[in-house]
Amino acid sequence: MRSRKKLNKRKIFIAAVFTAIIIITVICIDIKIKNKIEQISIYYCNISVSEIINKSVSKTLNDNNTEYSDLVYELYDADNKLSSVKVKTDKLNILQTQIISDINRQLLNNSKNKIKIPLGTVSGSYLFSGRGPEIEIKFLPSGSVSSALNSELTSAGINQSCHKISMNITADITAVFPSGSCNTSVQLNCILDRKSTRLNSSH
């Protein structure tokens, strides 16, 4: 009788240990898969959002037929030599507003789309890559896009300078997938225009 009770207790203990191992294994696999989904989501989010930002910048510049002279005052000295450059803040601000508005609109439209990743790809196994049921991922804007204008004059050789006007654009995005979500911030520096100029050597 005692030996039977001991045997039952041993079976219960083994079953409990086996169950605990299975639960821990499942939890570890779930965490690993979720982390992999987050990595993949952030990767594709950066590609998708960067493409939207670049297209919005190009579209806005083209729609306005923007040229360097539209954004900058070139100041000349008495000898008609270029002495300095000054950005047209008002026009740049208008351009900046148009670009951000278009980016926000495109991000909102893009949130209706989904990318699909095979579960085998998420597993990280080469054998199962591209196989299995698909996981759907959506990218949702989690706030308004922010930006900062930059005007930079750098040396490009003897008495030669390169003036560059750019925008640092930041978009906060939430990637949503079946097992949860993750947040990421996509940052991109977009050149609005640039020009190499020869400055007066006396300045």
Protein language model annotation of sequence segments:
Residues 29-39:
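Aromatic-capped interface at the extracytoplasmic side
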Residues 197-203:
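Conserved small/polar residues in nucleotide/adenosyl-binding loops
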